[in-house]
Amino acid sequence: KRHVVIAEGVGVELHPTDVTEEKLIILKDAGVTKISIGIQSFQEEYLKLLGREKTDHNKIFDALKKVQFETVSMDFIFALPGQTLETLKTDIEMAFNNGANHIAIYPFIDFTFTDRNFIKMTNRKKKKLLYEIVDYCNKKGYVRDSLWTFSKHGNSRYSSMTRENFLGFGCSATTLLENKFKINTFDIYEYQKRINENELPTSLTLNFSRRQRMVYYLFWTAYSLRVDSKDFKEFFGESLERCYGFELLVARLLGL
């Protein structure tokens, strides 16, 4: 707070085993206002598919009751074998009924360097399931605030992707500045070494041209499902139509 203006709070990503009353108190006392918990699923069969150990969720719920934050988001994965809307509804309601006021539901992403011992859901089924999730959340009155995220009451958000600028701390964290994008090292020991030597843990820095910064802005603004021409002009000092008139025309012709 001595060096930067914090406009949208301080968020921390947590593993379920880290959600204890003691640790939450430490985070809150340090100024953290938002937390995101990587639940993935409350159901043991899907945790096994993901190689995750079973967690005592009641301990998590109890800790969240005792130590409250402005935003408590829980992350889930959909499009796993055998998953249906009914199984996902169970996860969604359990989250919102036990301390979460925001959820993120991401499709399973198969990274090439990870082991997977099950068959992926087809893109057609995945898309159908996403539409079912969106319809269900709309009927329940939950507010969709980005492609994969929903707020219980519409006033809680947790995402760096939809912020114009942000600072990231920790392994693999990213930082977005006015014309730079920085990625921290993924290696824990290298991260610790750099910090102990009073060096930045950055492993990659991208210097944006003005055009690249605009593209980045538009890509992640679209992620929030709404591109506002007034916001674009306020941020860049130029109109969206002037900078991307041709692209917008093509998009309209394609019905986008």
Which positions does each model-derived feature cover?
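C-terminal scaffold of the Radical SAM
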Residues: 1-238
